[in-house]
Amino acid sequence: MTSYDPTLFEGAAAHYRYGRPPYSPQLEAALAEELGLDGSGRLLDGGCGPGILTIRLAHLFEEAVGLDPDAAMLAEGRRVAAERGISNIRWVQAVAEDLPEAAPGPYRLATFGQSLHWTDEERVVETVYDMLERGGALALIVHTVEGRPEPPSPGPPRIPHAEIKALVEKYLGSTRRAGQGVSQVRTHRFEDVLVRTRFGAPRSIFVPGIPDLVRDSESVLSGYFSMSSSAPHLYGERVEDFAGEVRELLAARSPEGLFWDWPGDTEVVLAVRS
């Protein structure tokens, strides 16, 4: 496997599914309609983590492949898939730069759910182009609030992200960390990458997010522990001190322990192989 920092998401796998806001419940139907998915062909989910997308989309294909370099993330994906009786997923431990050898095509759809930025983007996109069937698609899936109407609050207060981030900085410093290094700030859009490849200019579809998503305090804390920049191992022996301060803050902001989370709509950036 190409070089990978195994501490990048160390300790995060158990928090990921519980702590990350879900994509639109209409995502599967939207992809099926846009791409004519009918249960045939194969799916490649790159940087799949614990299989959030892999598991949701597997029923739309004959076979799904979840690819990720983190063994704990893949183990979590296997566990959940087994619990749900999903048997058509193959899990591959590799980075996207190991494609195509790590998981040879062809594929009808390749997805990256908020994960392409961890890769050598242009190189990986060009590789994926060759792995797709003719007419196959690459879908980059993200939450977005940009230009999207905000729904009315369902009642509970918003998650106090600014205050929690201040606590993260108190414990970890002002430099945003990631594994053994620092997190790189992304300054470009996916469209900027795709237009330089054989895919050309992509198009975006927007699928309605969950307007009344309410999360409890432990889910909010797990959301931070699921991030590379705030993974449990970064806090060392002070991890419980950090967790305690976050819980105190959340209890002060919402005695009921409930918070409104609006991650936005689900944006799918689609590019099709000609």
What do the predicted segments below correspond to?
Residues M1-D38:
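Conserved class I S-adenosyl-L-methionine
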Residues R42, P50-D98:
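Class I SAM-dependent methyltransferase SAM/SAH-binding core
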Residues G46:
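Conserved beta-strand/loop positions that form the S-adenosyl-L-methionine
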Residues E101-L109:
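A short acidic, Gly/Pro-enriched loop at the edge of an enzyme's catalytic core
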Residues L109-F112, E121:
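A short beta-strand submotif of the Rossmann-like class I SAM-dependent methyltransferase core
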Residues W118-V128:
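A short, conserved alpha-helix within the catalytic core of class I
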Residues Y129-P211:
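Conserved catalytic/acceptor-binding region of the Class I
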Residues V185-S274:
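Conserved Class I S-adenosyl-L-methionine
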